[in-house]
């Protein structure tokens, strides 16, 4: 049986739905693109803070399959930012021991970005301080559906094997905590399989504002919770009623 409380020395898997870039910018009279640029700065802050706060795997929701519906100019700007991040952050990631993986579809990304992703993944493959996963053109339901299609050809299947089909990785730790910024309270098709028992933390802070202290607050809340994984809290012997007293 899994422990009710996650040990603080155990490396966590945290997912973050990075929401609120556009609203942050609009409230300041700035373009939505400027909000996304500020969001990249927040990514840098949190990637630096995560290992120091006990996070071993960090999955960031950058672009969902539904985000293609946004205005073309905004989508183009987001793809430019992704290209810029891949080109300019790799050396910093390598220097800090960060291993990068990009999850989601790659066949619909603009020309050159898929190649840049592969190069960044190869360059950071030896990183062991933090496993950074960035979800781009990602849908958890599509990931599960694709895994089910592959599993249909198998004669036997375990939960661990199916999990590898969903995530594309063997031995990936289930998500411990999902954080969503901007005050919205929904998962938006993010990590539905690997986050089945994840704790949820919602904050009013917009993503460009989110910093190490906000991450620490979310983790403090997480560590104060009892995680029962579908079971019951352990009952002490003295709490069990005696038949003689019934």
Please provide the spans of the model-predicted regions.
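Flexible, compositionally biased loop and terminal segments
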Residues: 1-246
